[in-house]
Regions:
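Charge-biased, low-complexity intrinsically disordered regions
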Residues: 1-109
């Protein structure tokens, strides 16, 4: 289960929340299924103030499962699994980037 950390706010542009987790498994379409529960992320937005870091990679925003993003877009979403999922729409992110279960994931907003 993911741990939530609250960071002190020093500027209005500084993130105030961080949740750390791991990639728990790889889904049937090659998406990364994390240990971060969707419920923890309800206050995180879909804009550039939210960053999702996983290994050496990053995307912005946490979108609903039915995000409607076009093919080849890197997206973090509240997955059907009940946990944060990271995908490249229409492509196996696990195969394309060589990412395996066990790697770190961090969401800040």
């Amino acid at each position: 289960m993911a741990k939530q950390k609250t960071l002190s706010k020093t500027k209005s542009t500084t993130p105030t929340n961080q949740v750390d987790g791991v990639i728990e498994s790889i889904g049937p379409q090659g998406q990364l299924i994390t240990s971060i529960e969707n419920g923890i992320l309800v206050d995180a937005g879909q804009d550039e103030s939210v960053s999702v870091m996983f290994g050496a990679h990053m995307t912005v925003g946490v979108y609903p499962e039915d995000h409607g993003q076009p093919d080849a877009t890197l997206v973090a979403s509240m997955g059907q699994s009940g946990f944060l999922e990271i995908e490249i729409v229409g492509v196996s992110i696990s195969e394309m980037l060589g990412i395996k279960a066990g790697g770190p994931v961090s969401v800040t907003w």
